[in-house]
Amino acid sequence: LGTTTVECKSGYGLNKESELKSLKVIDEVNQSHDIDLIATFMGAHAFPPEFKDKHADYVDLICDDMIPEVEKQGIAIFNDVFCENGYFTLEQTRRILNTGRKHGLVPRIHADEFEDSGAAELAGETNSISADHLMAVSEKGIQAMIENNVIATLLPGTTFFLGKSTYAPYKKFKKAGVDVALATDY
């Protein structure tokens, strides 16, 4: 059977035009072969240089302009945010995910990759379909994921690629009853 489905994300242009272009390309390529491509809008992957000191303005752009246009064009299923200290805060992430949900996008979170930021707990609070990475997830985060059926998406290749030694606690997730998915991050 092999690979049947691949998730593809935007999040590398970090402006409206580039984000929409990435999602349109995913949609067009999806029409041309048998592997299902699932598009995820990830305008909240990082802050572009022009918003270095204007984070609130970039979050406004995502919520007030990008997400409504993604919905209008019907070019994504999921909405993902990189919720981590130094990136998007819990409050910014909550706003972006709730806005996405109002526009028909299913929430997901890049959570607790470098330290426990409370993002796994937020994944539970926002009823996200999944929380990705989770190398520094807390017990409270695991509990919130259990209570809200959040899938733990583990990406061991990221740990290896970054030269880190800490992997997501697979055995804790399985013992706790959290559904686990494995992904490559590529």
Model-derived regions: residue spans:
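Short intrinsically disordered, low-complexity coil segments enriched in acidic
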Residues: L1-V6, N127
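Metal-coordinating catalytic core of metallo-dependent amide/deamination hydrolases
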Residues: T4-S117
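Active-site-adjacent C-terminal substructures of enzyme catalytic domains
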Residues: V106, D116-Y186
